[in-house]
UniProtKB/Swiss-Prot annotation:
SUPFAM superfamilies: 4Fe-4S ferredoxins. GO terms for cellular component: plasma membrane. It is a peripheral membrane protein. It comes from the Bacteria. Residues 210-229 bind DNA. GO terms for molecular function: DNA binding; FMN binding. It is found in: Cell membrane. This is Regulatory protein NosR. Pfam families: Fer4_5, FMN_bind. GO terms for biological process: positive regulation of DNA-templated transcription. It comes from Pseudomonas aeruginosa (strain ATCC 15692 / DSM 22644 / CIP 104116 / JCM 14847 / LMG 12228 / 1C / PRS 101 / PAO1). Keywords: Activator, Cell membrane, DNA-binding, Membrane, Transcription, Transcription regulation.
């Protein structure tokens, strides 16, 4: 029996240790080793990391009783979507002065960073927030606000780092406000307004009520009872059903400093005396009440402070003491009702009252729950000085520009920052439209057309691709499809202005002419292939044509790749983004071949093959081209002209088409055509197009003889 007792005690001990270990493991699961490491690096002396507290899961970092700082995850505070459509999660560490000590990326789904730009660059960017206060303004790039902190973007991931900036600063500010470390932005004081002192005509009571100079708060006994429901004072002194609508208090208040208000209510003599008693920066308020409840009470008699009325502005409470109170014996406004209580209260200069900003008069109602205990509830009367009584300081041009810039949403700030690139791109697209609409005239001048096209391809590669990073991707298509089913947000697609404009133009051109306009003119990687192949031809590199029967069947590969990527995206968009590396765009265009060797080898291999057979990748492997080809069947226009002889018997255009988009029977395959317009130059060339050459020869034979050119011996 003794042994049994020992065994039971041992099991209790083991069970207690198991509970302790489970608790520690649970805490460790909540706070990862990486988060602990970052905290230890910032605060090496930290002894305790508290549990998540409050709405934002903030952990208190302490050494003994001293608070060293606070740590939290941004995903608990804000979920702003990044370029991938999903939020980025960071751990942010604040010190007690609301200074950011660390911001570290814990999780992201950005495709350019998953496979592309090294993550170290993103961590290096987030490290720049060390030393920034939570109430400072941080701008990625340049800013017209001289007070703003500016940080450089990460090349190739501008949108991502702008979202990171928004996430870090918004989350840090929100948490710092919740912890009481800084003021709420909504409570930040503007430059105070001044009351106009010009003489003004007096107004009646109804006129002052009408323009908002006097504000009114009416409360019934039933409203008071309802306010105490759920508290310890519920049911104490409640009115029965017959008396719920009886008035509890009818309260009025106004700022007396404006002459039109003060003279109307107090009369000229009393108003002058009141203004003479006020020091600069002091403001007087009239409070008038009727009903069973006294807004003055009797507390000020015992303690010298009025405990039933107070003002609140910018989150600050303005309380009134007996020295701030003046008796008011009479009010002179025409049509004014009678009041049981009247008083004037003065806000002192040290309380920094601003007559130009909204404020509230709070009425506090107390119910006794014990000999000395009681419960308070408050009722607010919103007040605002009419604009005609105020003079506001004019902001400087720099302040206006800073305010305008700060008020812009994130996507609009990106557009402003890239306004030059947007302007150049829009100009280039207008030029492309002009080429398309004037194609019949331009193709009659082959040399001009070829130079124009070569120049446009060089612009697409160098400026649009390598400089502006305007390379569309099948990832954009997958993201768009998922957004349609998971909550479409325009901000996500507007966050990159160049891609948004390109996609808008591409979508319109698909409906009008098919995929060829984008693939042949606006794809930087396609332009790179075409320019390299042109150079290879000039260097007499041999060219190989795939037999058309084989070529036609190889078209299916890109559609299969597209279906595989779409299927993967249904399981995991991040997995599909990684599989989309079948596109060499990131390597060759976005990152300029600055990647791991295997990515570079893949892109270079495609370009080497392209030297011998033009645009092999575009023809057979490009999932983006496949996605654009699907809606091409619905195109509205077919401006590529053909003749009856095309394909039967003439095969010139089919042989010359460098991507083999013309069937042997002469039909142009719209799903494969890149709209290079070479066939149209041949179509209009009377010295090259066989049907035109034959017609010219026939006309020459049937033309009447010219006697002046017949030799004399033949006459």
């Amino acid at each position: 029996m003794r042994a049994l007792r020992f065994s039971a005690g041992s099991w209790r001990c083991v069970f207690a240790w198991m509970l302790l270990l489970v608790g520690l493991a649970a805490q460790g699961a909540e706070l990862s080793e990486l988060e602990r490491l970052r905290i230890a690096q910032v605060f090496p002396a930290v002894e305790r990391i508290g549990d998540p507290e409050g709405d934002y899961g903030v952990r208190r970092l302490s050494k003994g009783e001293e608070t060293l700082g606070y740590a939290f995850q941004t995903l608990s505070v804000t979920d702003i979507p990044a370029y991938s459509g999903k939020p980025i999660n960071l751990q942010v560490i604040l010190d007690p002065q609301a200074v950011i000590r660390d911001a570290y990326v814990l999780e992201h789904h950005e495709p350019i960073l998953l496979i592309g730009i090294p993550e170290e660059k993103l961590h290096a960017f987030s490290a720049r927030y060390d030393g920034v206060r939570a109430d400072q303004r941080v701008v990625v790039g340049r800013s017209s606000d001289p007070q703003a902190v500016t940080v450089d973007a990460v090349s190739g991931a501008t949108v991502t780092v702008m979202v990171v900036n928004e996430i870090v600063m918004r989350a840090a500010h929100t948490v710092a406000v919740a912890l009481g470390l800084i003021e709420d932005r909504g409570n930040v004081r503007p430059k105070p307004a001044q009351v106009r002192q010009q003489p003004a005509a007096t107004a009646s009571w109804s006129e002052l009520l009408g323009n908002g100079a006097i504000r009114r708060l009416q409360l019934s006994r039933g409203q008071i009872d309802d306010a105490f429901k759920g508290s310890e004072a519920e049911g104490i002194g409640e009115a029965d059903a017959a008396h719920r609508d009886e008035p509890f208090i009818d309260l009025y208040s106004a700022l007396l400093n404006p002459p039109a208000v003060g003279r109307s209510l107090l009369g000229d003599n009393q108003y002058r005396e009141l203004m003479a008693s006020l020091k600069p920066g002091e403001y007087a308020f009239v409070v008038l009440g009727d009903g069973e409840y006294s807004f003055k009470g009797s507390g000020y008699v015992r303690g010298g402070i009025f405990d039933r009325v107070q003002l609140r502005q910018f989150g600050d409470i303005i309380s009134f003491r007996d020295l701030d109170y003046q008796r008011l014996s009479d009010v002179y406004a025409e049509g004014m009702p009678e009041f049981r209580e009247m008083a004037i209260f003065v806000a002192r200069a040290s309380q920094r009252f601003d007559p130009g900003s909204p404020w509230t008069l709070e009425l506090l109602v107390r119910r006794q729950t014990g000999p000395v205990a009681g419960v308070f509830t408050s009722f607010e009367l919103a007040c605002q000085t009419p604009e005609e009584y105020l003079e506001r300081p004019q902001p400087t041009a720099e302040e206006l520009a800073a305010l305008e810039e700060a008020a812009r949403p994130l996507w609009l700030r990106v557009w402003y920052q890239k306004s030059f690139q947007v302007g150049v791109l829009c100009t280039a697209l207008v030029l492309l439209l002009a080429i398309l609409f004037l194609q019949d005239r331009l193709v009659r001048r082959p040399r001009l057309m070829q130079r124009l096209r070569t120049g446009y391809l060089a612009f697409t590669l160098v400026y649009l691709g390598w400089y502006s990073l305007g390379q569309l991707s099948v990832v954009n298509v997958l993201t768009f499809v998922h957004a349609l089913f998971e909550g479409f947000r325009w901000e996500l697609f507007l966050s990159d202005p160049l891609l948004f404009i390109l996609w808008t133009f591409t979508a319109a051109s698909l409906l009008l002419w098919g995929r060829g306009v984008f693939c042949g003119w606006l794809c930087p990687f396609g332009a790179l292939q075409e320019l390299l192949n042109e150079l290879a031809r000039k260097l007499r590199v041999p060219q190989f044509q795939v037999p058309f029967a084989v070529h036609e069947r190889l078209w299916a590969i890109k559609y299969i790749i597209l279906l595989v990527l779409f299927g993967l995206s249904l399981e995991s968009l991040a997995l599909a983004e990684q599989a989309a590396e079948v596109e060499p765009f990131k390597t060759a265009i976005t990152l300029g071949f600055d990647r791991q060797w295997w990515f570079v080898a893949y892109a270079v291999a495609l370009l080497v093959v392209n030297l011998f057979t033009r645009k092999v990748y575009c023809r057979y492997l490009c999932p983006l081209g496949a996605a654009l080809a699907i809606p091409a069947k619905a195109r509205l226009f077919d401006w590529l002209k053909r003749r009856a002889e095309c394909g039967r018997p003439c095969q010139l255009c089919a042989r010359e088409c460098e991507i083999q988009a013309i069937h042997p029977d002469g039909r142009i395959e719209a799903n494969e055509c890149h709209y290079c317009l070479d066939c149209q130059m041949t179509y209009h060339d009377q010295d090259k197009c066989p049907p035109l050459v034959n017609k010219r020869k026939k006309r020459a034979k049937s033309a009447p003889a010219d006697n002046a050119r017949i030799p004399a011996e033949n006459l």
